[in-house]
Amino acid sequence: MSNCELTVLKPAEVKLSPRDREGIINPMYDCQPAGAQYAGIGIKDCIPLVHGGQGCTMFVRLLFAQHFKENFDVASTSLHEESAVFGGAKRVEEGVLVLARRYPNLRVIPIITTCSTEVIGDDIEGSIRVCNRALEAEFPDRKIYLAPVHTPSFKGSHVTGYAECVKSVFKTITDAHGKGQPSGKLNVFPGWVNPGDVVLLKRYFKEMDVEANIYMDTEDFDSPMLPNKSIETHGRTTVEDIADSANALATLSLARYEGNTTGELLQKTFAVPNALVNTPYGIKNTDDMLRKIAEVTGKEIPESLVRERGIALDALADLAHMFFANKKVAIFGHPDLVLGLAQFCMEVELEPVLLLIGDDQGNKYKKDPRIEELKNTAHFDIEIVHNADLWELEKRINAGLQLDLIMGHSKGRYVAIEANIPMVRVGFPTFDRAGLYRKPSIGYQGAMELGEMIANAMFAHMEYTRNKEWILNTW
């Protein structure tokens, strides 16, 4: 008989739980009005009007300027004590008329509530009816769409605020235009992604010979001042694009929490089929997206994308087993990003042991198939904390959690610096590394970019800490 023993590996555990305290320490997500403003600035000839204090606009615009290195026009009703007591309806009505007079090309105004205006109970829909009558009287030859966006800051996050604004603007405009002739186009809701991701998606659709409208089209967030470019608004999604969404062949929702509700609205109201697929982080998710596009449109996946896939696979294979295998990773940010990056990490042999999701939609996460997929494929334990903050990350590191890499936005950089752990910047906002908003994180090209960013962060850390840096001489 042999003396060898049989080791039985315990099954991996994926634990999903909320933050274990009421107070927030070092928040990792923004409020609902911030997300609503981001959706608004993606629309051409649109200026969001935030019904609240000036800080609800000023600090969000600062975040946009830090991330994109561009200025964005967002208006505020500048709520003060008097309005908090007697109501702020007059501030809304005055703000809408001032915007209409100041911006002759203005066509859309999302009216975004805040915690203060939701608490005092301002009737936004009633104010919009009053504003519409005033606009018709003063500007009979112009049509300005006013969309009510209810985004109290005391619940949800920038993710739910983004989704709410997109849905409200689409409902307002499509209800006004109704159903028209079929366009044969594809509606695409990529969610909260960077301009570089939008450019990549456009290229994919062009190579597949598919006509698509991407909502919201942020490509011009990074573009020169050209003669036909608006100096007030940077978004490329037009009112006509939004109205035409009711006539589309189908909707492709690439973000479960950041646009899928609008796809469901179009399906329910105008019978436009809605196909929900995972945000295309990594190879498999990109494969699934392209297959779905081919299935819906009848187009073939071109050789150019097959070649790009092969290049990405080759680049990632050069890194995965030698440098990434068994490396522990913590990821924080909004849910579609975090779960998508976790799937990508699994593809390249990284181990996403801690996922921090800055949102309070706990019941929805329990039904997310990506979490079930992680349970079925991981050979290591994973902890997922929703409604999280950055203290949840710092606390676990201080308690002894061994990490080789942190992935998240720039607000978490001091945690990585203090713990001497390499960090890759992804998500929003990223302002301490140059030009990240221009680079894609999705698709085959994005997978290759992410893999190389991770590798280079690890390589730099090996050199600065003199930890087996000699390996880089022989690689």
From Swiss-Prot:
Protein name: Nitrogenase vanadium-iron protein beta chain
Reactions listed under catalytic activity: N2 + 8 reduced [2Fe-2S]-[ferredoxin] + 16 ATP + 16 H2O = H2 + 8 oxidized [2Fe-2S]-[ferredoxin] + 2 NH4(+) + 16 ADP + 16 phosphate + 6 H(+)
Signal sequence extent: none
UniProt xrefs under PANTHER family: LIGHT-INDEPENDENT PROTOCHLOROPHYLLIDE REDUCTASE SUBUNIT B
Superkingdom of origin organism: Bacteria
Cofactor binding comment, as recorded: Binds 1 [8Fe-7S] cluster per heterodimer.
MF-aspect GO terms: ATP binding; iron-sulfur cluster binding; metal ion binding; nitrogenase activity
Function description: This vanadium-iron protein is part of the nitrogenase complex that catalyzes the key enzymatic reactions in nitrogen fixation.
Record carries keyword Manganese: no
UniProt-annotated binding residues for [8Fe-7S] cluster: 31, 56, 115, 153
Matches recorded under InterPro entries: ChlB/BchB/BchZ, Nase/OxRdtase_comp1, Nase_comp1_CS, Nase_VnfK
Enzyme Commission number, as recorded: 1.18.6.1
Subunit structure: Hexamer of two alpha, two beta, and two delta chains.
Pfam families assigned: Oxidored_nitro (PF00148)
Cofactor(s) listed: [8Fe-7S] cluster
Biological-process GO terms, alphabetical: nitrogen fixation
Family per record: Belongs to the NifD/NifK/NifE/NifN family.
Lineage: Bacteria, Pseudomonadati, Pseudomonadota, Gammaproteobacteria, Pseudomonadales
